[in-house]
C-alpha cells in the first residue's frame, strides 16, 4: 500500500510539474507575440510620421522658397 501511495504522488507531482512548464511556455509565447505586434505597430507609426514629416517639409519649403 505504501508503494502505491508513493507511485501516485510521484505521478501527480510529475504531471503538475509538466503542466506548469507548459503553461509557462504558453505565457512566454503569448508575450513574445504581443511584443512583436507592438514592434510592428511602432514601426508603422514611425514610417507614417516620416512620410508626413517629408510632406510637410516639402510644402513649407515650397511656400518659403524665394521667387526668381
From Swiss-Prot:
Tissue localization of expression: Expressed by the granular skin glands.
Locations listed in the record: Secreted
One matching Pfam family: FSAP_sig_propep
Secretion signal, residue range per the UniProt entry: 1-22
GO cellular component, one term: extracellular region
Keywords: Amphibian defense peptide, Antibiotic, Antimicrobial, Immunity, Innate immunity, Secreted, Signal
Biased composition (Acidic residues): 30-42
Main location: secreted
Region (Disordered): 26-47
InterPro entries attached to this UniProt entry: Frog_antimicrobial_propeptide (IPR004275), FSAP (IPR016322)
GO biological-process terms attached to the record: defense response to bacterium; innate immune response
UniProt KW Secreted keyword: yes
Propeptide: 23-46
Annotated function: Antimicrobial peptide with activity against both Gram-positive and Gram-negative bacteria. Antibacterial activities have been tested against Bacillus cereus (MIC=12.5 ug/ml), Escherichia coli (MIC=50 ug/ml), Leuconostoc mesenteroides (MIC=25 ug/ml), Micrococcus luteus (MIC=1.5 ug/ml), Pastewella haemolytica (MIC=0.8 ug/ml), Staphylococcus aureus (MIC<l00 ug/ml), Streptococcus faecalis (MIC<150 ug/ml) and Streptococcus uberis (MIC=50 ug/ml). Strongly inhibits the formation of NO by neuronal nitric oxide synthase (nNOS) at micromolar concentrations.
Additional remark text: Forms an amphipathic alpha-helix over residues 47-60 while the C-terminal eight residues are more flexible and less structured. The flexible region may be responsible for the lack of antimicrobial activity.
Assigned protein family: Belongs to the frog skin active peptide (FSAP) family. Frenatin subfamily.
Protein's UniProt name: Frenatin-3
Amino acid at each position: 500500500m505504501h508503494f502505491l501511495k508513493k507511485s501516485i504522488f510521484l505521478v501527480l507531482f510529475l504531471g503538475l510539474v509538466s503542466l506548469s512548464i507548459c503553461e509557462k511556455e504558453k505565457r512566454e509565447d503569448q508575450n513574445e507575440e504581443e511584443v512583436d505586434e507592438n514592434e510592428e505597430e511602432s514601426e508603422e507609426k514611425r514610417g507614417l510620421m516620416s512620410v508626413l514629416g517629408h510632406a510637410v517639409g516639402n510644402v513649407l519649403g515650397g511656400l518659403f522658397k524665394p521667387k526668381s
